[in-house]
Amino acid sequence: MAGQNHHFGIYAPEKIPYAITRYVNETNRLYGVLDRRLAGQEFLAGDAYSIADIATYPWVVPWERQQQKLADFPHLKRWIGSLQSRPATVSAYARGEPFAAQPAVTEAGKNFSLGKLQQDLEGV
């Protein structure tokens, strides 16, 4: 859902209010699920750091771009802070820093991708 949130809120060439609202709200609901899960345990799958944490963390790091407020999710906020300070996380994000300033998709890439999709749909 966070991916759809990013697509409709950031990348889509046409801003569709219904889609943006739907995915912002769905992301909010899922943040609530994560927050409730983390209320009684340190990590998503229990008391040990696991692939569940590794796989989920990158989807919640851009919480501001997803139009979420961490103040609404205190357990999720704690978990993000905990993972953010892990040496492996610090190292991984430092290695990715040179790429972070670049757009994930260029305008030409967007146009190609969306144009290709349109061509595919017209061919159906």
Task: State what each model feature region is.
Residues 5-9, 73, 99, 111-114:
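Juxtamembrane/interface motifs at transmembrane-helix termini
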Residues 16-19, 47, 69-72:
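Residue-level recognition of alpha-helical structural elements
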